[in-house]
């Protein structure tokens, strides 16, 4: 999250007249992330203070956004702990603000767990599987917009910034993934709505009173799309289950996440066979996007672009893993 579009408390107070949320008590920009303008919003209504998240969308359009917002509502209605969009008085969950689409969602409890252990990863795996199953009857369709077609489209824009070794890595890995995506095995993998960006900072944990942490929920669904469930798992594992310095997978955390996921939605033999391919796909997706954001940035207050070398390192690790001599952690 970031702040590209600034907005005053008075402007929000006028905008909120279309909602039944009461009076604005605080509006505070959120610095993390790089896609939309996000704010913590506190209101008071009938003597009660409530907290929300206001998002102004910088890239997504009014036509694109219903997929994401209605997916969040769909999952929340089925007991998955995700932010629920708040409708205005006319029932709409998307309204213009400063000429851009904007929405208000409930604020989840807790804080991000940036140094997760195996138990945190198990909770994430369990909820991710339940989220995948809960989304099976979601009627709207939209592909993951940051998948192979986007990698190919972005490749010529970022190649000039890379050295010879990086250019070769990018071109060879896109070719590898194109062949994988065209395969019969890939076509047969289970699919449905996926988060596609489930990093440590997109989940919240709260203390349960006994010193343990309970998963408060997943948020930031604005990269979601219909994709292979295994891709969603790989993206998640590539962040939650690694040593940040080296990019290596931690076996205990990886197996905790995968086993918890498998207990809810059993993973198949075909998914096991292509686990390394999907880990590579997940690493490639974020290497490409971080290169793009780093070298072709947009202006924004509080913008904090991520270092692209992190996912380059992860991708090289995944490519270099030899399943015969050093199998990647699995269930």
Curated annotation (Swiss-Prot):
Keyword set includes Nucleotide-binding: yes
Family designation: Belongs to the pseudomonas-type ThrB family.
GO biological process, one term: threonine biosynthetic process
Pathway(s) the chain acts in: Amino-acid biosynthesis; L-threonine biosynthesis; L-threonine from L-aspartate: step 4/5
Group of enzyme by EC: transferase
GO molecular function: ATP binding; homoserine kinase activity
Source species: Cupriavidus necator (strain ATCC 17699 / DSM 428 / KCTC 22496 / NCIMB 10442 / H16 / Stanier 337)
Reaction(s) catalysed by this chain's protein: L-homoserine + ATP = O-phospho-L-homoserine + ADP + H(+)
Pfam families registered for this protein in UniProt: APH
EC number per UniProt: 2.7.1.39
This protein's name: Homoserine kinase
Signal peptide range: none
InterPro entries, per the entry: Aminoglycoside_PTrfase, Homoserine_kinase_II, Kinase-like_dom_sf, Pseudomonas-type_ThrB
Keywords linked to the UniProt accession: Amino-acid biosynthesis, ATP-binding, Kinase, Nucleotide-binding, Threonine biosynthesis, Transferase
Family annotation (NCBIfam families): PRK05231.1 (NF003558), thrB_alt (TIGR00938)
